[in-house]
Amino acid sequence: MQILDHMALLSPLDWIAAGAILVSWHILGWMIEHPFAKRPSVTVLMSERRRDWMKVFVTRDPRIFDSQILASLRQGTAFFASTCLLAVGGVLALAGNTEPLRGVEAEVTAMTTPVLIFQLKLGLVALLLTNAFLKFVWANRVFGYCAVLMAAVPNDPADPTAFPRAAQAAELNIRAAINFNR
């Protein structure tokens, strides 16, 4: 069978459900990143706090506290990335052996669904989880870039490059957080 023949096995409701998932995912992400002015999202509020953090960072001595916060952020991204990887593995294992799904299907409906339909539906879940994994890995990497830039901030607050570099570190930190939240 060709791929189009396999796709023909999906019902119109399957296509509507897949479309609704993808459209909802896109709209929700857009609403989080572009909130209404009266009700800013946590992402917008935290972006300002991250900028404030880097302004204070320039004058803080010692900077161990800041390195611990950044290490904690990186550990969070690494945890979620590894969790996504485990979930992708679980979904792919389930796609390889759909018997557990057939058992649930037998209890819920009188219909029998071809194995390929289960695999196609699980494929969408695997793609979404893979996207999440890549976003978490990228966020972890950008937090690493932020750490390098923070290390490049001079210890002397009077240095003319101190605050501009801290501002750059803040923007990298914000970018990493945005990727983490996507």
What are the roles of these predicted feature ranges?
Residues 53-67, 148-178:
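Solvent-exposed, non-transmembrane helices and loops of integral membrane proteins
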Residues 114-117, 123-167:
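Cytosol-/stroma-facing membrane-proximal "stalk/adaptor" domains immediately downstream
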Residues 1-5, 85-111:
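Juxtamembrane "helix exit" motif at the C-terminal ends of alpha-helical transmembrane segments
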Residues 66-93, 118, 122-126, 135, ...:
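Transmembrane alpha-helical segments and their cytosolic interface motifs
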Residues 14-42, 80-89, 122-144:
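Hydrophobic alpha-helical membrane-embedded segments
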Residues 8-19, 109-125:
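Hydrophobic alpha-helical transmembrane segments
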Residues 32-70:
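Membrane-interface amphipathic/juxtamembrane segments adjacent to transmembrane helices
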